[in-house]
């Protein structure tokens, strides 16, 4: 996912400036990573029936992030982890509104294909997945974070390990466990 033309060091330097109170640094980071954020948004909206578009999702995420009282980001991976979390919240809110309009519906069948979901009823699935992730977080916050960062954030195993401060092998085990748990929970 990383754009080779955007240096990790530049993003980290700008995030440091943001921590020091330079609010313009956030806009510069956003400009530098906009293309990658669009790719992240597209992955959040991979369901064929999605009516929320990529640009709207990226812009709504920007508004939520720029208004955050205090953003304490360490590096590019941490930034994408937060952006993924915010985008997931926006997609879930959108699904709730959409689901409220439809009320009801059939049961949802969910299958994992390595890292992607096969979706039959988008709004219902997003809500079911969000509820299951809430239950997973109660069981194990780390399993939940690994799934969220890998699936919603599009982070690699290495980036996920860096963000969470754990070993690569731990991320690999947790990624396997979280997908298996969610598969059982949502079957």
Predicted segments with their positions:
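Sigma70-family region 2
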Residues: 16-20, 43-48, 60-78
